Amino acid sequence: MNKFEDFAIKLREILDIEDIKIDEPMKEHTSFKVGGPVDILLTPKHFNQVVDVVKLCKKENIPYYIMGNGSNLLVKDGGIRGVMIKLVKLNKIQVKGNKIITESGVSLKDISTTALENCLTGFEFACGIPGSVGGAVTMNAGAYNGEISNVIESAKVICNSGEIIVLNREEMELGYRMSSILKNGYTILEVTFNLEKGNKENIMNRIEDLSRRRNEKQPLEYASAGSTFKRPQGHFAAKLIEDSGLKGESVGDAQVSEKHSGFIINKGNATAKDILTLISIVQDRVRQNFDIDLYTEVRIIGED
């Protein structure tokens, strides 16, 4: 029995977590559909289980990682040594007046739907973002001139000591695809959004318009992690990539989408190595042509 199998037994016995998998292929848990096995993947149902797992990992010196639904995650082919804590079962959501209070595993689509049902406006921009709340807040996700920082009020997080604290919007230091939560390695448990009362028909029309635009412009028929690169200041990554002659460029089954050059897609059987090689080709070509560095928006973890 290796140390991770022994640790999995401790998790089951001490923390009463039933959903624990050993050597679980991460390609089954990411939207890119690639990635080697993680030593332990567990899916807690409650805040206190997440807190207890984090504390136990720290005590036993076991590396741990946090994920939602894996829509912005690229796991390398060698997999992950340690524990992956998947938060998708933290999925409670409630409405109090103009506020939506949601656990970190709730999808942005479900929040958009809840807002619509309660005639709350401000969250329409996120209707097509495939991620869950925790990752979206951590990265200050955005689309169509909206972003999380415009609608968030507070977040309940686990800080590095294992203590649960509440951060207000200013303390989160939300910028373009960044936050103090990301910088400090905090884990989000719950988020409160503050929206405005609106007209249900107008909200629905806005959601339908954004969904139509997204379907027309993005390669949703293929596995991907959404926009692969962050937007360089004063430029658009997709235009730089296309102007570098890279639309349709492929490595194995990884391809710069012919529909939207800002997306690298998996056409079926790509490996993480294929995707990472293609990312490097894109970065090198754009740097050579425009003297601009492209940085990945997708989170890359694991071993080669």
Swiss-Prot record:
Q: Name one GO molecular function term.
A: FAD binding
Catalytic residues, per the record, are: R177, S227 (proton donor), E297
Q: Which family does it belong to?
A: Belongs to the MurB family.
Q: Which residues constitute the signal peptide according to the record?
A: none
Q: Which UniProt keywords apply?
A: Cell cycle, Cell division, Cell shape, Cell wall biogenesis/degradation, Cytoplasm, FAD, Flavoprotein, NADP, Oxidoreductase, Peptidoglycan synthesis
Q: What EC number(s) does this enzyme carry?
A: 1.3.1.98
Q: Which InterPro entries match?
A: FAD-bd_PCMH (IPR016166), FAD-bd_PCMH-like_sf (IPR036318), FAD-bd_PCMH_sub1 (IPR016167), FAD-bd_PCMH_sub2 (IPR016169), MurB (IPR003170), MurB_C (IPR011601), MurB_C_sf (IPR036635), Oxid_FAD_bind_N (IPR006094)
Give the protein's recorded name. Answer: UDP-N-acetylenolpyruvoylglucosamine reductase
Alphabetical GO biological process terms? cell division; cell wall organization; peptidoglycan biosynthetic process; regulation of cell shape
- Species the sequence originates in: Clostridium kluyveri (strain ATCC 8527 / DSM 555 / NBRC 12016 / NCIMB 10680 / K1)
Reported cofactor(s): FAD
Give the record's pathway.
Cell wall biogenesis; peptidoglycan biosynthesis
List locations, semicolon-separated. Cytoplasm
Instruction: Specify one Pfam family.
Output: FAD_binding_4
Gene Ontology cellular-component terms listed: cytosol
Enumerate the catalysed reactions: UDP-N-acetyl-alpha-D-muramate + NADP(+) = UDP-N-acetyl-3-O-(1-carboxyvinyl)-alpha-D-glucosamine + NADPH + H(+)
Superkingdom of origin? Bacteria
What does the UniProt function comment say about this protein? Cell wall formation.
In what residue span(s) does the FAD-binding PCMH-type domain sit?
33-198
By its UniProt entry, which SUPFAM superfamilies does this protein fall under? Answer: FAD-binding/transporter-associated domain-like, Uridine diphospho-N-Acetylenolpyruvylglucosamine reductase, MurB, C-terminal domain
